[in-house]
């Protein structure tokens, strides 16, 4: 079972970081481009009650995840969102999009993507998967060293907003984890305003 490292930065100094990071990965580490990575998150508010409805779609996962509250998450067909919009019982509130690519470098799979709210840059997300061990304790320093060497060699002073290391059987990020990441982002924005 691979070990995953998810790291999210929102420092303005990293706003133009995606393209050079991808180029460096390919040129220096001979990374093989596997596919594009696109995630779309949408938040709706109930027109009558103070409830929220969230949708999450990934191009690497055919089903859509719908979440009415934190305890209830279901796999849904994309048509569900069309029905929600047409009934006008839910009002669109905001959306985030992750746009990037997935690469393979030896025992690592690396996904790098910009996080956008409409067209405004909100951060950069890194997802590193390591197949060398199943132990999170052993893999964490290996992933961190790989990450620093590949991406932050000249910019070590930037600190992540979110960092997590864990086991998961699949190589792609679980939709529920991405939903939690977006929730954290929304909560952080709400606290600032």
Swiss-Prot record:
One Pfam family of this chain: Med20
GO biological process, one term: regulation of transcription by RNA polymerase II
Keyword rRNA processing: no
UniProt GO molecular function: transcription coactivator activity
Keywords tagged on the record: Nucleus
InterPro entries reported in the protein's UniProt record: Mediator_Med20
Main localization of the protein described in the UniProt heading: nucleus
GO cellular component annotations of the record: mediator complex; nucleus
Subcellular location(s) per record: Nucleus
Subunit structure: Component of the Mediator complex.
Family: Belongs to the Mediator complex subunit 20 family.
Function: Component of the Mediator complex, a coactivator involved in the regulated transcription of nearly all RNA polymerase II-dependent genes. Mediator functions as a bridge to convey information from gene-specific regulatory proteins to the basal RNA polymerase II transcription machinery. The Mediator complex, having a compact conformation in its free form, is recruited to promoters by direct interactions with regulatory proteins and serves for the assembly of a functional preinitiation complex with RNA polymerase II and the general transcription factors.
Name the record gives this protein: Mediator of RNA polymerase II transcription subunit 20
């Amino acid at each position: 079972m691979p070990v995953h490292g998810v790291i999210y930065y929102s420092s303005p100094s990293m706003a133009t970081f995606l393209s050079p990071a991808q180029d460096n990965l390919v040129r220096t580490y001979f990374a093989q481009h596997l596919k594009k990575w696109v995630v779309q998150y949408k938040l709706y508010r109930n027109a009558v009650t103070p409830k929220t409805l969230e949708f999450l779609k990934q191009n690497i996962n055919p089903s859509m995840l719908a979440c009415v509250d934190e305890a209830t998450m279901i796999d849904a067909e994309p048509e569900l969102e069309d029905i929600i919009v047409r009934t006008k019982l839910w009002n669109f509130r905001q959306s985030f999009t992750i746009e990037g690519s997935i690469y393979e470098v030896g025992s690592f799979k690396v996904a790098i993507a910009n996080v956008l709210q409409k067209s405004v840059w909100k951060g950069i997300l890194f997802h590193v998967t390591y197949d060398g061990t199943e132990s999170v304790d052993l893999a964490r320093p290996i992933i961190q060293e790989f990450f620093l060497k590949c991406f932050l060699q000249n910019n070590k002073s930037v600190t992540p907003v979110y960092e997590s290391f864990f086991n998961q059987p699949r190589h792609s990020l679980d939709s529920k984890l991405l939903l939690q990441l977006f929730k954290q982002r929304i909560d952080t924005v709400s606290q600032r305003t």
